[in-house]
């Protein structure tokens, strides 16, 4: 009777430990350079077609990552950035005000960005201001609060917004999985 109990315990512990280790393996690989970048991200990239009538740049969100520190969610990295200069978009920086870091920071606060978030300044003539708060960059502990907003550098209009609710199913799973893997979920 004792030996059967130990065998059963060993099998149960082994099964559940294997499940946890498999979860860590899959969530870790989802943002690794080769497996994540070549296989996972193309499956779960945010569809830029959701941004109606917004001209897109040749640059992707991955270009916003500097020195290996991500500032946008992994599900957006392969998605093209919007391009400034078209005059489209929703009201952002009030008319008559210059579009600069100060007015974009005020807009971020008005849009509900509180606490830690990033504002990326445009790097090219068609570049955009990008306001983001997400778990990949350590801004948030809850991936369901991930949010990225793009602002036209000339007009101050909001060109595009991507939030967790807009992500495809696999991008949602990747965002939650990475936060879980890093121990950030819920902090």
Model-inferred region functions:
Residues 27, 88-94, 161-163:
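Charged, low-complexity surface segments at secondary-structure and domain boundaries
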Residues 1-49:
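Internal alpha-helical transmembrane segments
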Residues 17-21, 25, 124-134, 176:
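Short, charged N-terminal helix-start/capping segments
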Residues 5, 100, 104, 169-173:
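Alpha-helical structural motif
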Residues 35, 53, 179-181:
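Juxtamembrane/interface motifs at transmembrane-helix termini
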